[in-house]
From Swiss-Prot:
Gene Ontology molecular function: peptidyl-prolyl cis-trans isomerase activity; protein folding chaperone; ribosome binding
Protein name listed in UniProt: Trigger factor
SUPFAM superfamilies to which the protein is assigned, alphabetical: FKBP-like, Triger factor/SurA peptide-binding domain-like, Trigger factor ribosome-binding domain
GO terms, biological process: 'de novo' cotranslational protein folding; cell division; chaperone-mediated protein folding; protein transport; protein unfolding
HAMAP family: Trigger_factor_Tig (MF_00303)
Name of the gene encoding the protein in the UniProt record: tig
Its job: Involved in protein export. Acts as a chaperone by maintaining the newly synthesized protein in an open conformation. Functions as a peptidyl-prolyl cis-trans isomerase.
Swiss-Prot/TrEMBL catalytic activity: [protein]-peptidylproline (omega=180) = [protein]-peptidylproline (omega=0)
Domain PPIase FKBP-type: 165-250
Naturally occurring in which organism (per UniProt): Campylobacter curvus (strain 525.92)
Subcellular location: Cytoplasm
Domains as described in the record: Consists of 3 domains; the N-terminus binds the ribosome, the middle domain has PPIase activity, while the C-terminus has intrinsic chaperone activity on its own.
Length: 441
């Protein structure tokens, strides 16, 4: 076996190899002998199957396995020749050539290794920021929203028009092509106007009606509607308003309401409620500040400052992902062109290369920052996060976890959690230049 290993840069090695046919044959026979010891074949005792029989029946599979073994041998030998360490190898090698010939196989591949990353001086790149202020009006608005959720419904007397936020108790029946359809009728149905529970246009069509009013509301079922026989079809709903209700927010908070809003507090009070609301608003504002401003600004700065060679295979994977994500945005003509023209695909992929390089570099920088700052996420935390996601979407947690595991997504989820934890810690609640106590205004 002839192997050459030529460094492209500090993390990528170009490998070329010539594997002779007798080496391939020897590898196939070795695998056949091993298989013969355990294989069951009718007419032969287990462990006494002739190698020739194994070769005859499973030559294709054995050859494929032998080629995989040879590829591993080529890679291992190339690692030694390049002076790299096997535990520094990252991802699968990019195989650019694997030509089978009468006298053997010609192999060309690129092996990539984890880069050495230094983030010395990163602290100077953390953007200056001030902790977002929580205003008194923010607290009052959120408090009213909470109180509205727990406020009892009261009947609206008289002939007041129905408006968004009201609850309508009404009868309705739906018709498509002049015919009533199953599930399209109800009496004294209670609906919050503006909640979006009904198909688009239905609730808007009810606004302005008064108790006792009737109306035909014309709507169109969404194209993606769950019932295929109704999807995309126009419909008419005959509605009659029986009663209008509204939530009455109490002027003062009684003990029962406070306990309902804060069930885990031993001594709930209006002051404690406002403090909890203030904390939540502050956390929401900090999260938005990090997500919208601080993180992008910091990411751009560190990618620009910390330069290093990136693993070619990881960059290519990132390009593939960006290309796939963009696919739905392409016109049908563009898709057809990409299906038929490999050169067009290659040219389009190159448009994502710079962004892919930056994305990969940022991933390694974040990994090093997490190491330096001691930020870790355990496998158990990942499982809990996946389970929580499953519970929220009404899915089976174990099946949801297994789906991510089978897709190889758990490492990416873990990295995302490490990143979130890192930035939340880095951009703490205190001002970078000051630690002035925040006050509600």
């Amino acid at each position: 076996m002839e192997i050459n290993a030529k460094p492209i840069d500090s993390v990528n090695v170009e490998v070329s190899a010539k594997v002779k046919s007798d080496e391939i044959k020897a590898s196939v026979e070795k695998l056949a002998k091993k298989a013969a010891k355990t294989m069951k074949v009718d007419g032969f005792r287990q462990g006494h199957v002739p190698v020739a029989i194994v070769l005859k029946r499973y030559e294709k599979e054995l050859t494929s396995d032998a080629e995989q073994d040879i590829l591993r041998d080529v890679l291992n030998e190339a690692i030694k020749k390049s002076g790299k360490k096997s535990d520094e190898l990252i991802g699968e090698p990019l195989i650019s050539k694997f030509d089978r010939k009468d006298d053997g196989i010609d192999v060309e591949l690129t092996a990539s290794f984890k880069p050495s990353v230094s983030v010395e001086g990163y602290e100077a790149l953390i953007p200056e920021f001030s902790t977002p202020r929580v205003l008194k009006k923010d607290i009052d608005e959120k408090k009213n929203e909470l109180l509205k959720m727990f406020a009892p419904l009261e009947k609206v007397e008289g002939k007041r028009a129905l408006k968004a936020g009201d609850f309508a108790k009404f009868d309705f029946e739906g018709f498509v092509d002049g015919e009533a359809f199953e599930g399209g009728k109800a009496e004294n149905y209670l609906l919050e106007i503006g909640s979006g529970q009904f198909i688009p246009g239905f609730e808007d069509g009810m606004i302005g009606l008064k108790t006792g009013d009737s109306k035909d509301i014309e709507v169109t079922f969404p194209a993606e509607y769950g019932a295929a026989h109704l999807a995309g079809k126009p419909a008419v709903f005959k509605v009659k308003i029986n009663e209008i209700q509204e939530r009455k927010i109490p002027e003062t908070l009684d003990e029962n309401t406070l306990k309902a809003i804060m069930p885990n507090e031993e001594k709930p009070s209006e002051e404690l409620l406002e403090e909890r609301i203030k904390d939540q608003i502050r956390q929401d504002k900090i999260f938005k500040l990090i997500s919208d401003e601080l993180k992008p600004k910091f990411a751009e700065a560190v990618v620009e400052k910390f330069k290093f060679d990136t693993p070619k295979n990881i960059v290519e994977q990132e390009i593939d992902m960006q290309f796939r994500n963009a696919w739905n945005g392409f016109s049908e003509d563009e898709r057809k062109k990409f299906r038929d023209d490999k050169d067009a695909v290659a040219k389009k992929r190159d448009e994502y290369r710079d962004d892919a390089e930056k994305s990969v570099r940022l991933t390694f920088i974040i990994d090093e920052l997490a190491r330096v700052r001691g930020v870790k996420v355990s496998d158990q935390e990942v499982v809990q996060a996946v389970y929580f996601e499953a519970y929220r979407s009404g899915r089976d947690p174990k099946a949801h976890l297994e789906m991510y595991r089978n897709q190889g997504m758990l490492p990416a989820i873990k990295m995302s959690m490490i990143e979130e934890k890192l930035f939340n810690e880095m951009f703490s609640k205190e001002d970078k230049k000051s630690s002035k106590k925040e006050k509600a205004e």
